Every structure is written in structure tokens, then in C-alpha cells.
């Protein structure tokens, strides 16, 4: 195929053999041919550019559609779905669809997802801290439970010992009043016999001042509290067991 340079060389060789008019016609024909070839090439490139622009527009529409917040992806990031999270302990960003539709900065679902992921990471830190606090509280409760269990076992042992002592002494077969007296004695209450006039001038209970004309001894209950205060109650026939029991419990 003859190139442009070859054609020019050929023209130069024929300059002397042809007249000027023929030479001009050949040059014009050559220029026209080059122009047509160039125009065809430009049309081809213009067509390619148009096709690429259409592809760009289509791709942008697809990207915008992906970024757009629809019903499905909005529900995925909606904070109202996180029912296990207390709103008081952790605050999520509330993505409002109506407001996001008017704002380009919040109308990108991927930006919203990234923001929600950051919030979830922060929530994970909060949950780990709360779990640590719960484990600490649980360990403290277990420690208190063990102490209470040991105390309960100690009380049960003392109660079993008391019941065994009562059973060995035959107290269980005695009168209920005697059982109460033995119980009071085990609680540190002293039961003594004393003449009625022994406490007539003392500072005991008013019932201790009750007079008795005979010189026989009466049963007395001497109650000592934690402050070593002594209270004396004369056990008289007119006093019921209920009164005596309540009196003793009040003084303990």
C-alpha cells in the first residue's frame, strides 16, 4: 500500500512531466481523501464517546440505586430493632428516612452502615464493661452466700446439739412451761428462788414489788441483757405463760 510519503515523492518526480493544473488537481484530490478518512475516524470516535457516556450514566444510576435507602436496608439498620439495648445506657443515631431523603450526606446507605458499625463497636465495649461488673457482683453474692451457708450450718449444729441435750435430759416429755424455762436458760436467762422481800427496795420491774404475806420463797426470773442490766420478775400464779414469755422477749 502506497503511503503519503511515497505519493509525495511520486508527485515530486512528476512535477517536471505534468503541467501545473494536473498537479493541483491531484493535490486537491489527495487532500479530500485525507479529509474523508479523518472525518470517518472522528465519527467513529464520537460514537465510542457517546456509548461510554451512556455507560457512565447507567453506572451512576445503578450506584445511586445501591446507595439509596429503601425499606429493606433501612430496617436492617433501624435502631428500633435492637430491643436488647437499653436506650438509657446507650444512644444510637436515629436515621430518619424523611430527613435522609433530603440530605445527600445521609442518603448513602453505606455511610449509614459504617456509622452504625462504629456505634455497635462502642456498644460492645459497654457490654463487656457491664459483664465485668456483673461477674464482680456475682462473685460477691457467691461469697456472701457461702458465708450465710456456713452460718446456717453453724446454727443447725447448735440447734441439733440443743435438741440432743433436751432429748437426753428428758425435756421433750415435760410440760410446755418447763420447756420454755429450759429454753430461756439456754438463752442466758437465770431462774432463781428468792424471798419476796429480797427486792422490795430495788429498782427492778413493777411486778417484782408485788407483796406476798407468807415467807415462802417464790420463783423469780432474772434477765440480763447485753448491757448487763438486770430485770427481775416474780413468777406468780396470776401471771400467764403468754405474759411471762412476752416480758422475757421484750427484755432480751
From Swiss-Prot:
Residues 41-71, 115-170 form a coiled coil. It holds the Pfam family Spc24. This is Probable kinetochore protein SPC24. GO terms for cellular component: Ndc80 complex; nucleus. Keywords: Cell cycle, Cell division, Centromere, Chromosome, Coiled coil, Kinetochore, Mitosis, Nucleus. GO terms for biological process: cell division; chromosome segregation; sister chromatid biorientation. Residues 194-217 are annotated as: Disordered. Acts as a component of the essential kinetochore-associated NDC80 complex, which is required for chromosome segregation and spindle checkpoint activity. Belongs to the SPC24 family. Transmembrane segments: none annotated. PANTHER family: KINETOCHORE PROTEIN SPC24, PTHR22142. The keyword Coiled coil applies. It comes from the Eukaryota. InterPro entries: Ndc80_Spc24 (IPR013252), Spc24_Fungi_globular_sf (IPR038066). It is found in: Nucleus; Chromosome, Centromere, Kinetochore. Residues 206-217 have a biased composition (Low complexity). The lineage of its organism: Eukaryota, Fungi, Dikarya, Ascomycota, Saccharomycotina. The gene is SPC24. Component of the NDC80 complex, which consists of NDC80, NUF2, SPC24 and SPC25.
